[in-house]
Amino acid sequence: MQLTELSIKNQNVFVQHYIDGKEEMSSFFDYSIHHKDMWRERLEDLSSRFFAREELAAYLTSYHNKFGSSAMQSAIEKLKDPSSAAVVGGQQAGLLTGPLYTIHKIISIIVLAKQQEKELQVPVIPIFWVAGEDHDLDEINFVHTSEENGPVKKKLPQSYWKKSSAASTSLDQEKCAAWIDDVFAAFEETDHTNTLLDNVKRCLRESVTFTDFFELLIADLFQEEGLVLLNSGDPGIKKLETAMFQKILRENDELARAVSDQQAFMRQAGYKPIIESGKEQANLFYEYEDERFLIEKDNGRFVIKELDLGWTRDELHTHMEEHPERFSNNVVTRPLMQEFLIPTLAFIAGPGEINYWGELKQAFAVMGFKMPPVMPRLNITILERHIEKKLAERNISLQDAIERGTENQRETYFERQIPEEFTAVMDQAKSQIEAIHKTVRQEALKVDQSLEPLLLKNAAFIQDQLQFLERTVMKRIEEKEGYVLKDYERIQNSIKPLLAPQERIWNIMYYLNRYGPKFFTTFKNLPFSFQNQHQVVKL
C-alpha cells in the first residue's frame, strides 16, 4: 500500500479560500489553521474555561461498557486530566458505516489527535460525535453497490416514523439481515466474505436502533485507537446538556440575530450561506411521542405549531430542567453544544461543515465561546491496482479521473472509432432523400391536399429507417470496442461514481470484503498529513 498526494481544488469557493488561508477568513473563524502558534493558543484558551470533565467522563465510561474496549475506557479516563483536550468530528449514523467519508473523517480525528498529543505533550482524545438525534433517516438508510450499469442505491425496505431520530428508531432485524445479504451478494465472494458477513450480522443482532448498529461497527473497526463515541441522541447525555439548553433559551433572540448578521456579512463578501435559518426559529427541537419537532417563536411564546403546544420562556426553562431528554439541537446549536461539553482542541470538518461553521462565528461569541480551530478532514481516494493499470492503458491521468471522471474520454474514444466517411455518407443520404421526398410531396399535394399528413408520416418513417441503420452500425462499433469502452466505465465507477467523489458513494464494506482486515489496519495507520492535499491510497 502506497500513499501519494495530489493538489485538487475544492469546488466550493469559500472552502477553497479557507484552505488557501485568505485574509478575509478571519471574519468567519476565530483561529487561523495556518498560524504556527495556533494549537498552543487554543490550548491556553481552553485552560481558562470550565468543563464538567468528571461528569462527562463518568457518563462516557458507563455508555462505553457495551463495547468492552480497554483502549476506549483509557481514552475516556484522559478527559479527567484538566490539561487534556479533544479532537472532535461527527457524522450521521449511516448503515454499514455510511459513505467512505465517514471512515475518512474518523481517521482524520485519530491522526490529528495523535499528532497533537505528541506535539503539545498533553493528552488529546479522539471523539466522534454520532448524530443520533438526527431524524432525516432517508439520508442514512441505504448504501450504493456496483452493478452492471454502475452504482445502484440499495435502500433498507423498512418503514419508520417520519420524524423519529436515528437513536430512537428500531431496526427490523429480519429485513435488515436480508438487506445485508442483498448488499453482500453484489460483492465478489472472497476468502474474507464469510467472516466479514458474520461479524456484520453479529453487530446487527446486538443492536436495537440505527445508532446502535453504526456504533458497534465503528467500535469494531477503531476501538484499538481509543476512539470515543458520543451519541447525541442518548437520553443520558441530556442531563449534562441542560444548562446549555437553558442558555440557548435565554440568548435565543440574540443567537438568531447573530446567525442572520453573519450570513448577511457572508453574502456581502461574495460567499453563499447554506444554513436555512430564520429569526422565528428557536434553533432547538422537541421530542414528542418519538418524533422531533422544531420549536419556533411566536409573539413572545415558544410554540410547536403541528402539535398546538406552547410555553412562555420561564415555562420552557423549567421544562428543560425537568425533562432535558426531550430537547435536541439543530444545525446552529449542535456546534455550540459540542463547545460547551467538550474541551475541543479542533473540529474536523467536511467541506459543507467548513461553509456552515463560517456562518456561526457571531453565534459562538453570543454564547461566550471562541469557535475551535476548524480543520478540513482528509480527502482520500482509494486506487485499486486493476484500476491503476487501466488508467495507464487508456492514458488517463489520475488527477483527471478524480476531478472530471472519464465520461468525456469514453465519448471521444468512441467517436474516433466511427469512420468519417460513414458519418458523411449518412448525413448526405438523409439530406438527399429528404430533398427528393419533398419534391414527391409537392407533386402529390397537387393531386389531393388531404394527403399531407400521410406524406409527412411517410417522410418521417423513411428518416427513422435511416436512423435505425445508423444506430445499428453504432451498436456494432460499441460491441466491437466493448472491452475498451468498459475500461473507461470501470475507472469512472471506481474513482468518480455518478460523477461524485468516490468517498461520497462507496462504502468501506466493499474494500473490507475484497482486501480483508489487514488492508484496513494498514490503511488507517498510513502517515496521512494535514497539508490540504488530496490523499491517494494505492493498493
Swiss-Prot record:
Q: Which residues bind ADP?
A: 146, 384-386, 490-493, 506, 510
Q: Which residues form a coiled coil?
A: 455-475
Lineage: superkingdom = Bacteria
Quaternary context:
Homodimer in solution.
What keywords sit in the KW lines? Coiled coil, Ligase
Would the keyword RNA-binding be found if you checked this record's keyword annotation? no
Q: Which gene encodes it?
A: bshC
- Specify whether Transcription regulation is a keyword of the entry: no
Mind telling me what this protein is named? Putative cysteine ligase BshC
Q: Any phenotype upon disruption? A: Mutant accumulates GlcN-Mal and does not produce BSH.
User: What's the source species for this entry?
Assistant: Bacillus subtilis (strain 168)
